[in-house]
């Protein structure tokens, strides 16, 4: 356990030293951080008036506010990991799913564990307590194992907070998969993240070490990796998913598309995606050839930002019109595409011929400083996960039910984040001191989400939501986007989803 605490500490320290964003002076309290704490700790619970949150057992989740408002200058900085690794997951669990959810007690202990893990960044002796907790609980031991494996695989690609937050979600997926009977689409998702990915990584590492020891040629090593990866996916992952589904995955997938009662709708969705992707590729090729962006943007940073946000716009066209048509199919599609993205990223990292170098050169043109910290290029994966999280969470809570909450990922990232970034960088004059984002960008985020959400209701894309509820969700999420230094693609969709559950 001490090894894990030290690894987490070293990871967070190294990433914080290399971080390029505006540094926050924790010696002095600022209004932006207070607003961030209030947004996460209080707004969802105040909106969720039917819950009795203020209990002694939940007092630990108010530690971020206590540390920031009452603590000395040496411990003020602990508020952020406590807020995002313990209080925020608990907010999702308590407000989003409720005390009667099947995984409540397991995930409750994980939230407490994350709080202690955050405190070990300041007080190393708490690792002894973590060690005792990990050895006394199978659930916490699983969470510890997930964290160790994730940090080892990803190196410095994620910040400490991002890494532990993702591990918390993976641990919840493990609990749901191995402790309870899950739906077929969850079986596919667990097969992707818990079976295929770890085994592929271990296999490829073994092949690379063997090739280096035996001095095998690069071409032969590449062939070995492709062959054994395909064999492993076919034997291990396919067997797992087949056991969960009760039939061959390819047969099940064919039936889901062509023999389901919603087959016509699903075929239309696939055709729509093909049309959108075809048009996007055509526009992308033309723009690369003619380079028209220099006429409208004055710096390379603005051009890069606009090019990155075109993929956010693509997400809007791909998913916004179809999210509520067939939530079950969207859940399945996101799970499949996530596996493809991760598999392609593996090819890029290993530079496997003939596609590895080509993929790397293409993706590298769209990277920023966050993609340069470790071996992974994560921006496009983050975008996909951010759009998928509300659909995954809603499916776990209610099943495949058409609802506005399915759209919040696309709204936050495709509309809000894109407009906030483009407007803020181009026209922003009034800067927020903590994050260097602009107030103009915050307003652009809120207005764009609000207007697009009302347009979707006007065109009957999704069920209706009251005017004040829409305004409140868009404004609160925009404020959090403006004052938080955490990754927008990860936290904003989950936060807006929680607000919807609190107001529902």
UniProtKB/Swiss-Prot annotation:
Q: Mainly localized where?
A: endoplasmic reticulum
Q: Which UniProt keywords apply?
A: Endoplasmic reticulum, Kinase, Membrane, Transferase, Transmembrane, Transmembrane helix
Places the protein is found: Endoplasmic reticulum membrane
Supply the enzyme class, top level. transferase
Q: Which GO terms describe its molecular function?
A: dolichol kinase activity
Query: Transmembrane ranges?
Result: 56-76, 78-98, 158-178, 188-208, 216-236, 264-284, 326-347, 374-394, 404-424, 441-461, 463-483
Q: What is its EC number?
A: 2.7.1.108
Q: Which GO terms describe its cellular component?
A: endoplasmic reticulum; endoplasmic reticulum membrane
Membrane topology, Lumenal segments: 77, 179-187, 237-263, 348-373, 425-440, 484-504
- Topological type in the membrane: Multi-pass membrane protein
Q: Which reaction does it catalyse?
A: a di-trans,poly-cis-dolichol + CTP = a di-trans,poly-cis-dolichyl phosphate + CDP + H(+)
Which pathway does the protein contribute to?
Answer: Protein modification; protein glycosylation
One of its GO biological process terms is:
dolichyl monophosphate biosynthetic process
Keyword Kinase among UniProt keywords: yes
The role this protein plays is: Catalyzes CTP-mediated phosphorylation of dolichol, the terminal step in de novo dolichyl monophosphate (Dol-P) biosynthesis. Dol-P is a lipid carrier essential for the synthesis of N-linked and O-linked oligosaccharides and for GPI anchors.
Name of the protein this chain belongs to: Dolichol kinase sec59
The organism is: Schizosaccharomyces pombe (strain 972 / ATCC 24843) (Fission yeast)
Gene name for this UniProt entry: sec59
């Amino acid at each position: 356990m001490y090894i894990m605490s030290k690894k987490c500490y070293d990871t967070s320290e190294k990433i914080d030293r290399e971080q390029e964003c505006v540094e926050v002076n924790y010696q002095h309290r600022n209004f932006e951080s207070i607003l961030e704490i209030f947004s996460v700790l209080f707004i969802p619970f105040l909106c969720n008036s039917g819950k009795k949150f203020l209990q002694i057992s939940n007092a630990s989740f108010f530690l971020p506010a206590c540390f920031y408002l009452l603590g000395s200058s040496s411990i003020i900085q602990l508020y952020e990991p406590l807020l995002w690794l313990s209080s925020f997951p608990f907010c999702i669990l308590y407000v989003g799913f409720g005390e009667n959810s099947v995984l409540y007690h397991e995930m409750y202990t994980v939230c407490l564990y994350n709080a202690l893990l955050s405190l070990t960044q300041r007080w190393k002796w708490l690792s002894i307590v973590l060690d005792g907790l990990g050895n006394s609980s199978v659930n916490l031991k699983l969470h510890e194992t997930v964290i160790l494996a994730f940090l080892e695989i990803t190196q410095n690609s994620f910040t400490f907070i991002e890494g532990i937050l993702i591990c918390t979600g993976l641990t919840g997926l493990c609990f749901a998969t191995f402790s309870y009977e899950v739906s077929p689409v969850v079986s596919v998702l667990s097969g992707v993240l818990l079976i295929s990915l770890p085994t592929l990584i271990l296999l490829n590492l073994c092949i690379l070490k063997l090739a280096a020891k035996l001095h095998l040629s690069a071409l032969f090593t590449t062939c070995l990796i492709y062959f054994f990866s395909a064999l492993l996916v076919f034997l291990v992952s396919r067997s797992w998913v087949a056991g969960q589904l009760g039939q061959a995955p390819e047969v099940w997938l064919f039936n889901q598309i062509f023999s389901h009662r919603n087959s016509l709708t699903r075929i239309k969705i696939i055709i729509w995606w093909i049309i959108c992707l075809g048009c996007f590729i055509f526009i992308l090729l033309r723009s690369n050839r003619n380079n028209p962006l220099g006429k409208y943007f004055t710096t390379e940073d603005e051009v890069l930002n606009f090019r990155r946000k075109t993929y956010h716009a693509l997400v809007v066209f791909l998913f916004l019109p179809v999210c509520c048509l067939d939530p079950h199919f969207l859940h399945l599609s996101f799970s499949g595409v996530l596996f493809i993205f991760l598999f392609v990223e593996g090819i890029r990292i290993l530079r496997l011929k003939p596609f590895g170098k080509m993929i790397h050169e293409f993706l590298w043109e769209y990277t920023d400083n966050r993609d340069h910290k470790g071996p992974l290029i994560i921006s496009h994966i983050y975008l996909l996960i951010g759009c998928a999280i509300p659909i995954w969470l809603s499916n776990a809570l209610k099943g495949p039910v058409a609802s506005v909450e399915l759209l919040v990922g696309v709204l936050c990232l495709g509309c809000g984040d894109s407009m906030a970034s483009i407007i803020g960088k181009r026209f922003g004059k009034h800067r927020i001191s903590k994050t260097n984002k602009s107030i103009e960008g915050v307003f652009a985020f809120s207005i764009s989400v609000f207007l697009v959400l009302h347009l979707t209701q006007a065109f009957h894309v999704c069920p209706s939501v009251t005017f004040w509820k829409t305004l409140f969700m868009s404004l609160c999420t925009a404020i959090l986007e403006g004052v938080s230094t955490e990754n927008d693609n990860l936290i904003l969709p989950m936060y807006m989803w929680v607000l919807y559950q609190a107001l529902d």
